[in-house]
Amino acid sequence: SISLNNSSYSFNDDLNESDIKRHIKYLSSDELEGRFPGTKGSELAIDYIASNFKNYKLAPFQDNSFLQFFDFSNLEDEKSRVANVIGLIPGNKNKDEFIVIGAHFDHLGYGGAHSGSLEIGSKEIHNGADDNASGVAGILELAHKLSLNRNLLNRSIVFVAFNAEEQGIFGSKYFINNSQIPKDKIITMINLDMIGRLRNLSLNVSG
């Protein structure tokens, strides 16, 4: 549950399991080739997330776009132009205060050397269902449900799908250093990472 306008709203009955599975299935499909930054698969993931933000009636975060572009160089010094995907639900009372909910959407592509894969001698698609299609599915579902209940929101909520996390949290660094939001106006940040499975029935929460 989450506190909204001095009341508690529970998502337990509203969460759509089929939508969550659909998001994970697409984002971790072979078509997206492991979502390595700067690749066609990464661009497909960006388009998918932005399209869902638009369908859920989120507002573009800056420059009338859901995309926040930045330059990325991988460990082999190959350069590309990549993007975070950002959507906004304006608050009603304290709209100049922000809660940020994020998850990285990139993964390891085909693996191999300099990818971060544990199997550096193998070149095959690393689908990344848990890491981190699961987290992206989480923010998409939260974006959908909170958008439907936007009249209950005191503060504004920013949803961010970060790019280039696996190679050194580049997307989140760029977001925080180039955001239109003053840092002292970010009340809290919730990051969803690898939420697709539980180990020993335990859930780790840190902050």
Label the model's feature ranges.
Residues R35-I89:
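A non-catalytic alpha/beta surface segment that caps or lines the substrate-entry region
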Residues K25-S28, Q68, N84-L88, F98-G102, ...:
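Structural recognition of the beta-strand scaffold that forms the well-ordered cores
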Residues L4, Y9, D14-L44, Y56, ...:
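N-terminal capping segment at the start of a domain
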Residues L15, D19-R22, Y26, K40-N55, ...:
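Extracytoplasmic/secreted proteins, especially bacterial periplasmic and envelope-associated proteins
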Residues G87, I101, F105-H107, G112-G168:
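Alpha-helical metal-binding/catalytic segments enriched in His/Glu/Asp
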Residues N94, F162-G207:
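Metal-dependent peptidase/peptidase-like ectodomains
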Residues S7-D14, D30-K40, D71-L75, I120-N132, ...:
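Second-shell loop/turn segments in exported
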Residues L27, F53, L75-S115:
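Acidic/His- and Gly-rich active-site-bordering loop/insert found
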